[in-house]
Amino acid sequence: DSEFVELKIRGKIFKLPILKASIGEDVIDISRVSSEADCFTYDPGFMSTASCRSTITYIDGDKGILRYRGYDIKDLADKSDFLEVAYLLIYGELPSSEQYNNFTKKVAVHSLVNERLHYLFQTFCSSSHPMAIMLAAVGSLSAFYPDLLNFKEADYELTAIRMIAKIPTMAAMSYKYSIGQPFIYPDNSLDFTENFLHMMFATPCMKYEVNPVIKNALNKIFILHADHEQNASTSTVRIAGSSGANPFACISTGIASLWGPAHGGANEAVINMLKEIGSSENIPKYIAKAKDKDDPFRLMGFGHRVYKNYDPRAAVLKETCNEVLKELGQLENNPLLQIAIELEAIALKDEYFIERKLYPNVDFYSGIIYKAMGIPSQMFTVLFAIARTVGWMAQWKEMHEDPEQKISRPR
């Protein structure tokens, strides 16, 4: 039997159905409140509001659980590669060997971008932030694929593959342009992660040999960042998509949202914070500053809007960070890592942080890994966008296949 909750407004009782979740919390359906009760709900930041039905990602923040299509994130990070996870998010199941091979071949074929896009990059000054370039470049793809301007006629699968394939190419192009080096074309003989590293670090006069430890670490980072329920950027993509905007425009809005320091820019902020702390001796002083509500200093990389336990992605990245720095000979002499390890140890024992359930999040160690790889801090959010494009496209595809989908219109 259906369950209801009763809402009493001005003496009149309204019965609101409770929708059963397949896993996690149930949901109260308030969709009729506005029309029948002559009022609507107020929920700043949508802290208690589900905007859609989704079967893509599940999070239990109290228990520190993250699953893609029912698969635990740690299992996927340990046993899968990024395009295998991309297939899982888009299609709902892990691919067979044949499906995986066909999917990866399609992604490789579509990794090349139109030559005329090169001229767009030349319009930016060399000091432009790579995310600013990415915003323009991704949006400009609409001009190269006019057939997708009518989303109802779009091939959702081909659109997703094109986007996943071209974002890393444009990301590497934005980096190369910022440092004055020539663009490097994709190499279809390399896998997804190897190809990106090749486009980032190879030059016409020198081949880049991909370190397998670096490749494995970046593969894990991409998997961990691929999707995360209805966060700010994903919700932005869905809202833009609900109006019928073309997919390239939708993804560019996601990139804009991701650029914010409270969202995708947090790992860059962690690096800046660790540099500001400077040495382990200064940690107690900065812990005190973080506790002082009148002090503008904030401890970046701790706490999460959803997780009230240790972020499962952070646990994977802490281990990965040690592997990368050991491989590069930086495990004992990386000052940022030493500060991060001691800062985490002190914070996890401090009652202030324990009471507020402020644990390290995914951004705490990812920036250290990137920096050790030779990736500059202004590129951190760009790499986040490469990974999250998979989630955005899975969510965009799911939204357009949802019979309940309507144009978003918050009150």
UniProtKB/Swiss-Prot annotation:
Gene3D superfamilies: 2.20.28.60, Citrate Synthase, domain 1, Cytochrome P450-Terp, domain 2. Keywords: Transferase, Tricarboxylic acid cycle. GO terms for cellular component: cytoplasm. One of its GO terms (molecular function) is citrate (Si)-synthase activity. It catalyses: oxaloacetate + acetyl-CoA + H2O = citrate + CoA + H(+). The keyword Thylakoid does not apply. Pfam families: Citrate_synt (PF00285). The active site is at 304, 363. InterPro entries: Citrate_synth-like_lrg_a-sub, Citrate_synth-like_sm_a-sub, Citrate_synthase, Citrate_synthase_AS, Citrate_synthase_bac-typ, Citrate_synthase_sf, Citrate_synthase_typ-I. The keyword Metal-binding does not apply. Pathway: Carbohydrate metabolism; tricarboxylic acid cycle; isocitrate from oxaloacetate: step 1/2. GO terms for biological process: tricarboxylic acid cycle. Its EC number is 2.3.3.16. Belongs to the citrate synthase family. Citrate synthase is found in nearly all cells capable of oxidative metabolism. This is Citrate synthase. The gene is gltA.
